[in-house]
Design a protein with these regions (language model features):
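Bacterial N-terminal signal peptides
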Residues: 10-19
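An acidic-aromatic
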Residues: 27-37, 98-159, 228-233
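Sec/Tat signal peptide C-region and signal peptidase I cleavage site
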Residues: 20-25
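N-terminal mature ectodomain segment of secretory-pathway/periplasmic proteins
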Residues: 49-134, 206
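Gly/Pro-enriched, hydrophobic low-complexity segments
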Residues: 76, 111, 126-127, 175-267
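Long, low-complexity, intrinsically disordered segments
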Residues: 27-32, 278-287
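Flexible, processing/modification-adjacent segments and terminal tails
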Residues: 41-59, 63, 85-87, 128-193, ...
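Bacterial N-terminal signal peptides that target proteins for export
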Residues: 1-10
Length: 287
């Protein structure tokens, strides 16, 4: 759910997912056993690392989103970044997202930094910076999943909600899942009853609030486990509209197309692949 800043891409931070340390406290040290003739009690049954109930909730959310032909929602991303004094400062981005499977995506983002716009129409990717009147355009692959991969690898463009808009969200998260458990229910988040689950995905600990009835993700709270600063990231998802009509001209912008061109390229091309700490970037996918 968080990434490095992308040059003109404003305060867009990459992070396919959020993580947060597990709620459980560290296990207390065992007391020295007393000598006794009584038969030792059997060891308690180990809790599975991947609880079926938690997996079922994540699968249901994935299935609900994957089945939608069109999708609209608002994503507000709160993330921390170190200040010059060393204290973590919180910044925010707001994304208005419109998607049409299998090959169209628009993201209109406002932020504490420069605003940005992203268009994908199945043939071209267009990234537009309104304040600077700059646009980067590239030929695009025929699916949203492939376009997101290209945008990240070519230009370090990443959205914190990426993992929830791909063709099969559960497949994406399950490939790197190491832990998943059910926490309970909340009646506070999103104005509805949500099921709370926690899981580790590609080195990120995530707590998710998912609608108990509609199966839609409402809140994600995450921290990279390998980040020594334990910076926190929160994604609020709201205003869901599934299978609503989308005008044909949604995924293009004449104003963006006429802006001053700039290369569709990584903002730091001198950086060698793999030099970024894992905690600061999107975990690489398995091949």
């Amino acid at each position: 759910m968080i990434r490095n800043k992308c040059l003109w891409w404003g305060l867009l931070v990459s992070a396919s997912v959020f993580l947060v340390l597990p709620n459980a406290q560290s296990k207390p040290a065992k007391k020295k056993a007393k000598t006794t003739t009584a038969e030792a009690s059997p060891a308690p049954e180990a809790t599975p690392s991947l609880e079926p109930k938690a997996l079922d909730i994540l699968k249901a959310a994935s299935s609900r989103l994957a089945a939608a032909h069109t999708m609209k929602f608002t994503a507000i991303h709160f993330y921390e970044s170190p200040s010059r004094q060393g204290h973590p400062l919180a910044f925010t981005t707001k994304s208005e997202v419109t998607l049409q499977r299998p090959d169209k995506l628009r993201v209109i983002m406002s932020a504490d930094g420069p605003a940005s716009e992203f268009y994908y129409d199945g043939k071209k990717i267009m990234a537009y910076a309104p304040a600077e009147n700059l646009v980067a355009v590239a030929d695009a692959p025929p699916t949203i999943d492939a376009a997101l991969e290209q945008a990240y690898h070519s230009a370090a463009i990443y959205f914190p909600f990426d993992d929830w808009i791909v063709a099969d969200p559960y497949k994406e998260m399950s490939e790197g899942m190491k832990l998943a458990y059910y926490i309970g229910q909340s009646k506070v988040v999103g104005g509805t009853t949500t099921d709370m689950v926690a899981y580790i995905d590609h080195g990120v600990f995530i707590q998710a609030w998912i609608g108990a009835e509609d199966k839609l993700p409402r809140l994600l709270h995450a921290t990279y486990l390998e980040d020594p600063e334990r910076l926190r990231h929160t994604l609020v998802l709201s205003d869901w509209q599934l299978d609503a009509a989308v005008p044909p001209d949604t995924f293009a912008s004449a104003k963006a197309a006429s802006a001053n061109p700039m290369p569709f390229a990584h903002p730091h091309p001198e950086a060698s692949p793999g030099t970024e700490p894992t905690a600061k970037g999107k975990p690489p996918k398995k091949q």
